[in-house]
């Protein structure tokens, strides 16, 4: 088993993509994680909500805002039995209202990250990491949270070299 886990939340369907709405079959974050999987030996886990947000972008962002304000912890489709075997967790997600989607909080709060290294990666269209790194540190106080990597979602398919540099800097390549 790999000692690195790539845990990610990604959204397909209608997305804000390079200043326009566009339908995508695979979400930007999942695209980036596929590239990472080609670069390193890692297991992957897709964080999926039991009741997913709307496929319509504008409706989705309103649902996500409502969940954020309510500090909701959406139920997930599944969870890994354990993350004990992993030293490093690459946590990848889109920027939802300046932080992670609430489903990512559900995932993080389910496990003990004490002594683990978390590498945040956030896809976005200009809003960067937001306060997600701070939120991860608060949610996982025993973890070593390294500097995150913001990836422009509309450039997800062209992120290989950026990912390579980041993974090398974090000694995963």
Walk through the language-model features, giving the residues of each.
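N-terminal beta1-alpha1-beta2 submodule of the flavodoxin-like/Rossmannoid cofactor-binding fold
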Residues: 1-88, 98-99, 105, 161-173
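Glycine-rich, N-terminal phosphate-binding loop of Rossmann-like dinucleotide-binding domains
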Residues: 93-94
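Short, conserved acidic/polar surface loops in the N-terminal third of protein domains
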Residues: 101-102, 131
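Hydrophobic packing residues within well-ordered alpha-helices of enzyme cores
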Residues: 104-107, 136
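Short, glycine-/small-residue-rich phosphate/pyrophosphate-handling segment
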Residues: 119-158
